[in-house]
């Protein structure tokens, strides 16, 4: 058995995620098998299982990788004091949209999440995660709109 360095393991993991992202975008999540991903990444299915417990975990890791820049952008905005809640809401939306527009990976993963994911049992954790993310985003928007109303900026 060949021992791999941390860098080689990280590169293998990234190539698996890259292959999954491309195939999910092309074929949809439910029609893409782990064997398809392994072949496209030039690895064995065993290598996939070394990094990811199942297809759902692989899907979640792909989502995490693409949403990290968005989460970081919103977190930076959270560190600033809120002067105008409507401007904060606009800034958050613009930060996320700017990443989707300029980052091909984020754009492709957003497309996969919204158009190419059939929520089956194998990616049920992704369905739950998506629902939680939507609820969190809605909560943020509601809080900012409520603050704007209380300040008289909105009727």
Predicted regions and their residues:
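Amphipathic alpha-helical packing segments from all-alpha helical-bundle domains
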Residues: 68-71, 75, 83, 87-91, ...
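Short coil/turn segments at alpha/beta junctions that flank glycine-rich nucleotide-binding fingerprints
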Residues: 26-30, 81, 103, 151
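Amphipathic alpha-helical segments enriched in hydrophobic/aromatic and basic residues
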Residues: 24, 33-34, 45, 55, ...
């Amino acid at each position: 058995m060949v021992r791999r360095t941390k860098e080689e393991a990280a590169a293998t993991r990234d190539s698996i995620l890259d292959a999954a992202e491309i195939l999910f975008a092309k074929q949809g999540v439910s029609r893409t098998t782990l064997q398809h991903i392994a072949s496209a990444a030039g690895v064995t299915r065993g290598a996939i299982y070394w990094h990811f417990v199942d297809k759902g975990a692989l899907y979640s890791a792909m989502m995490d990788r693409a949403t990290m820049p968005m989460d970081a952008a919103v977190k930076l905005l959270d560190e600033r004091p809120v002067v105008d809640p409507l401007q904060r809401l606009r800034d958050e939306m613009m930060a996320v949209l700017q990443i989707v527009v300029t980052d091909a990976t984020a754009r492709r993963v957003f497309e996969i999440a919204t158009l190419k994911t059939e929520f089956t049992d194998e990616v049920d954790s992704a369905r739950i995660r998506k629902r939680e993310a939507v609820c969190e985003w809605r909560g943020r928007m509601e809080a900012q709109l409520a603050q704007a109303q209380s300040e008289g900026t909105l009727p």
